[in-house]
From Swiss-Prot:
The modification N6-carboxylysine is found at residue 198. It comes from Rhodopseudomonas palustris (strain ATCC BAA-98 / CGA009). Belongs to the RuBisCO large chain family. Type IV subfamily. The keyword Kinase does not apply. It comes from the Bacteria. InterPro entries: RuBisCO, RuBisCO_lsu_C, RuBisCO_lsu_C_sf, RuBisCO_lsu_fd_N, RuBisCO_lsu_N_sf. Its cofactor is Mg(2+). Binds 1 Mg(2+) ion per subunit. This is Ribulose bisphosphate carboxylase-like protein 2.
């Protein structure tokens, strides 16, 4: 690129109508001049060629992505990980904020991702390592999306559960049980105090546990538990499947008693979820398979916060995400980034309920609550309820007992002295 070419991909905020731009934060490592590398990054994701041969024209003022901010630090030791790079020159670690005109692709998630996470970004000259750290949308862009139908307030209203976390449970054994014993486990967990008993993300519509039969039995169990406890309950059915079956499975599950639906967001596709949102009559709940493949590495891929924002944009009312436990291998600051992405203002898009999960139990509830900093979250044990030594009802009860202690300002171990279900949970799971 010539100096004039490079200059065409830089702008000041004051010179742009920011309502027309999505802002993107990237971290990248480059070989050669960082200013040229950042210009290439803008060019490749927008106007890779900005004029026709023989024409006096320039498409960059309207169509080019533009650098708003750039910082660069030399890396004398080279790239942070061994990587192929055809470019030569000093290596720099860079942080850039780019304004990308959303008129290039419109309010369409597949086209958005094709631009800001596509070939142009991950094959930009001189940049072998790059991570999209954040994405911010202007209000006119957000206005084209419906977002969550129910959001946090709607989910709480359905459960009549206010001023406390929402208590989920993953029915386990998660794979292998036929519908009848599976439903019995759900029933026990509801009577013990769960708000929502759910299918595992890997249990879908299979011949040995068909969704219609499973939903009918769990729907009946859910209604019985609600009547017996006097508290609303929800069965969360997994309808993850091929896109052309989503509306059919929605109708089957809801007609048979499911009060919410689980969809594995990235395997199914966010555009499919947006389509389903227009049809859905119950809350939609996201699970996180496939996301770590994008987000795990600190210097390459896509920050999971971006995925969280996109799931909210597509219409999920609840987003289950990797939580604070060591098994989840997610830095605490990244979990908190994702929680904020669910809760913070996003134009007309309703907040969605964050559910940080992974190997949780009554023994971890207080830690999760303190880290989140409010009661606006979901708590989703699996074995912490269904592997409780006294059974699923006691496992669910132990969760509620732990919350009662936290809400009353009583140390959880002290409360356990007079609550055997909680005491058993702390003994069984306290070392995790």
């Amino acid at each position: 690129m010539t100096p004039d070419d490079i200059a065409g991909f830089y702008a000041k905020r004051a010179d742009l109508d920011l309502d027309n731009y999505i802002e993107l934060d990237f971290d990248f490592e480059c070989a050669g001049d960082p200013h040229e590398a950042a210009a290439h990054l803008c060019s490749e994701q927008s106007t890779a060629q900005w004029r026709r041969v023989g024409f006096d024209e320039d498409f960059r003022p309207r169509f080019a992505a533009k650098v708003l901010e750039l910082s660069a630090e030399p890396r004398p030791s080279g790239f942070s990980v061994p990587v192929e790079c055809a470019a030569r020159g000093p290596v720099h670690a860079c942080r850039v904020t780019i304004a990308h005109p959303h008129g290039n692709f419109g309010a369409k998630i597949p086209n958005l991702l094709s631009a800001v996470c596509g070939e142009g970004v991950f094959f930009s000259p001189g940049i072998p390592l790059i991570r999209l750290q954040d994405i911010r949308f202007p209000e006119p862009y957000l206005a084209a999306f419906d977002g969550p139908r129910f959001g946090i307030a709607g989910v709480r209203e359905r459960l009549q559960a206010f001023d406390r976390p929402i208590f989920f449970g993953v029915i386990k054994p998660n794979i292998g049980l036929p519908p009848q014993p599976f439903a019995e486990l759900g029933y026990q967990s509801w009577t013990g105090g769960l708000d929502i008993a759910k299918d595992d993300e890997m249990l879908a519509d299979v011949d040995w546990c068909p969704l219609a039969e499973r939903a009918a039995l769990l729907g009946d169990a859910c209604r019985r538990a609600s009547a017996e406890t006097g508290v609303p309950k929800i069965y969360l059915a997994n309808i993850t499947d091929e896109v052309d079956r989503l509306t059919e499975l929605h109708d089957v599950a809801v007609a048979n008693g499911a009060g919410a639906l689980l969809i594995n967001a990235m395997p199914v596709g966010l555009s499919a979820v947006r389509m389903l949102r227009k049809h859905a009559t119950v809350p939609l709940i996201a699970h996180f398979p496939f996301i770590a493949a994008f987000s795990r590495l600190a210097n390459y891929g896509i920050h999971s916060r971006v995925m969280t924002r996109l799931q909210r944009l597509a219409g999920f009312d609840v987003v289950i995400m990797p939580g604070f436990g060591p098994r989840m291998m997610t830095p605490e600051h990244e979990v908190l980034d994702c929680i904020r992405a669910c809760l913070e203002p996003m134009g007309p898009i309703k907040p969605c309920l964050p559910v940080p999960g992974g190997s949780d139990s009554a023994a971890t509830l207080e830690n999760v609550y303190r880290k989140v900093g409010s009661a606006d979250f979901g708590f989703v044990p699996g074995r912490g309820v269904f592997g409780h030594p006294m059974g699923p009802a006691a496992g669910a009860t132990s969760i509620r007992q732990a919350w009662d202690a936290i809400a009353a300002g009583i140390p959880v171990p002290d409360h356990a002295a007079s609550h055997p279900e909680l005491a058993a949970a702390l003994r069984a799971f306290g070392g995790r």
